[in-house]
A protein has these predicted regions:
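PLP-dependent amino-acid enzyme catalytic core
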Residues: 1-310
């Protein structure tokens, strides 16, 4: 099962990108094709392998980490394959689908204050570890260098190969920062002219689960903003609108962070006359059908001639 992680397909965005200059192309890497359903399979497996090699993860230990969903799902899946118990701390308001998937893999969930978001989960996870340090192995996705290394060694080379080296711009949302840091470092090494641009919510209070508004958040230790060529802020409304367009015009059902990534990519694409833009779609949208992305928002959205209604 774990050998299936990586080598995800690259999709050219066509109908949604109509009207761009003919020499501008946008591609999205569909990370939902990983066995655990998201880009987080990559760093989760890299961190677990490192824990096993170092001896920090061994029989009798429980895997513990904070998550907004996808890393937790990845760790729960990996734990089930390897036979390790998994305990996760996540905000109480994450979607029911993510809770159910994690529990289906046999992992335990401890819920943190929903008003504190992912930062609250980080703090509560640290407290649990402090109370029982010998019980747990904590991958610590926000501070573990194995997180970006997974993308440096795998995701980055895949993207460069899939575009035949023609990529000119790379965009990714900021959650832990692992994807943008790891892919960005690899691409800059092979071609320093490639632009690496981060995507983040435009406000501290937002509905883009999995993404961090860095100015108001605990900054992950693996995130180094000075390595970026820029950042593009995206509103919740614009990201949601792009999700609807993708489902109706491209046949791709994705989550909020993917909508934000494509909105930012289109924003950039309209400003250039030639280039190959690649972004990441971290997962598919089946884990978000019970959230505000679809419930309620559908009443106010029209895509093409289709009016969404509950």
């Amino acid at each position: 099962m774990l050998d299936l992680i990586g080598d995800t397909p690259l999709l050219e965005i066509q109908r949604v990108s109509e009207g761009l200059h003919s020499k501008v192309k946008i591609y999205a890497k569909l990370e939902g094709f990983n066995p655990g359903g998201s880009v987080k399979d990559r760093p989760a497996w890299q961190m677990i392998q490192d824990g096993l090699k170092s001896g920090k993860l061994r029989r009798g230990k429980t895997i513990l980490d904070s998550t907004s969903g996808n890393t937790g799902i990845a760790l729960a899946m990996i734990g089930s394959v390897l036979g390790y118990p998994v305990e996760l701390v996540m905000p109480a308001n994450v979607s029911i689908e993510r809770k159910q998937i994690i529990q289906a893999y046999g992992a335990k969930i401890t819920y943190s204050d929903p008003l504190e978001g992912s930062d609250g989960a980080i703090r509560q996870c640290r407290k649990i570890l402090e109370e029982s340090p010998d019980k747990f192995f904590k991958p610590d996705q926000y501070f573990n260098p194995m997180n970006p290394l997974a993308h440096y060694e795998n995701t980055g080379p895949e993207i460069y190969r899939q575009t035949d080296g023609k990529i000119t711009h790379f965009l990714a949302g900021i959650g832990t920062g692992g994807t943008i840091m790891g892919v960005g470092r690899y691409l800059k090494e092979v071609d320093a002219k490639i632009q690496v641009i981060a995507v983040e919510p435009d406000d501290a209070l937002h509905g883009l689960e999995g993404l961090k508004h860095m100015a108001s958040s605990i900054v992950p230790g693996i995130y180094h903003e000075e390595e970026l060529d820029g950042k593009i802020p995206v509103s919740t409304e614009d990201a949601y609108s792009m999700v609807y367009r993708l489902s109706q015009e491209e046949g791709v059902l994705v989550g909020q962070s993917s909508g934000a990534a494509l909105f930012a990519a289109l924003n950039l694409a309209r400003k250039i006359r030639s280039g190959t833009i690649v972004t990441i779609f971290p997962d598919f949208g089946d884990k978000y059908l019970s959230t505000n992305l679809w419930v309620g928002w559908r009443d106010r959205m029209t895509v093409g001639n289709i009016k969404f209604s509950i």
